[in-house]
């Protein structure tokens, strides 16, 4: 089992130009990363595409709009200094987070701050990081206000060192679109418009421009277990419900009913005590005993 991410257009490109929007269609890949976006960009270039006259339009389907389901995730919509509280989405890069690399070249007084594999960050950066030993601790935070998202940095880092940190996005589909647009530009594909999202932009008959498959489901589960990754767990929970029902669940709690049914079919869990409202357990209302697991 794998999950597919596609780029589609309303019609076939002509003379290297996509007329209209470039649509990003996710398939619930919980491990989508920046290298995958580079792969999509490389496919466009291999097809001779050098320009998109419209926007990067990111579809929120097949999950739709998911609201925050825990205090941690609701708080993270405005600011986050962690990655664990990213909101699950049908399409979200780096587990729904910004990957930020802080490098301190020898001889420099200020550190370089940018993306990990995306080149420059496609959102504003505020503050600076000093290069010196024994200074205040490095602080990296994602802040969202009426102007949008930005990364705020402060503190210091030792000369010759580097730090990679992840900070939860407030809106993973938008963040994915911004990263893709930036990567396309670096790959030689000019996008005239900005980044927007929609529930569903076009049908299955839309022109397929590029396509990538995720790592196998088994490896996604392995990463979830190794890193105790909330984002993977809850995206996979949404995928389980989508597969079982053939339609998008209304919420993460609604999708988690499929996990409850699975535990009960296995003969575990007291009917009166078992509560599963997320696959990750980030929802504090979950009630499972060690015997249930």
Locate the predicted segments by residue.
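Conserved serine DD-peptidase/penicillin-binding transpeptidase domain
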Residues: 2-272
């Amino acid at each position: 089992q794998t999950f597919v991410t596609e780029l589609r257009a309303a019609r076939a490109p002509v003379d290297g130009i996509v007329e209209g929007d470039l649509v990003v269609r996710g398939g619930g890949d919980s491990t989508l990363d920046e290298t995958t976006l580079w792969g999509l960009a490389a496919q466009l270039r291999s097809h001779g595409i050098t320009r998109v006259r419209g926007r990067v339009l990111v579809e929120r389907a097949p999950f739709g709009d998911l609201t925050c389901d825990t205090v941690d995730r609701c708080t993270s919509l405005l600011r986050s200094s962690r990655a664990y509280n990213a909101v699950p989405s049908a399409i979200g890069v780096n587990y729904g987070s910004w990957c930020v690399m802080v490098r301190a070249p020898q001889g420099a007084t200020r550190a370089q701050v940018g993306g990990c594999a995306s080149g420059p960050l496609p959102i504003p950066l505020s503050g600076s990081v000093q290069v010196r030993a024994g200074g205040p601790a490095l602080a990296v935070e994602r802040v969202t206000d009426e102007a949008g998202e930005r990364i705020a940095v402060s503190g210091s880092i030792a000369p010759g060192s580097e730090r990679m940190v992840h900070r939860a996005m407030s809106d993973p589909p938008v963040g994915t679109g911004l990263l893709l647009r930036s990567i396309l530009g670096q790959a030689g594909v000019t996008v005239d418009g900005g980044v927007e999202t929609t529930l569903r932009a076009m049908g299955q008959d839309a022109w397929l421009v590029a396509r990538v498959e995720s790592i196998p489901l088994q490896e996604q589960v392995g990463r979830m277990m190794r890193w105790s990754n909330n984002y993977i767990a809850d995206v996979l929970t949404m995928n389980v419900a989508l597969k079982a029902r053939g339609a998008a669940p209304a919420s993460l709690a609604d999708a988690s009913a499929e996990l409850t049914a699975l535990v009960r079919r296995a003969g575990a869990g007291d009917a009166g005590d078992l509560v599963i409202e997320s696959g990750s357990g980030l929802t504090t209302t979950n009630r499972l005993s060690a015997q249930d697991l």
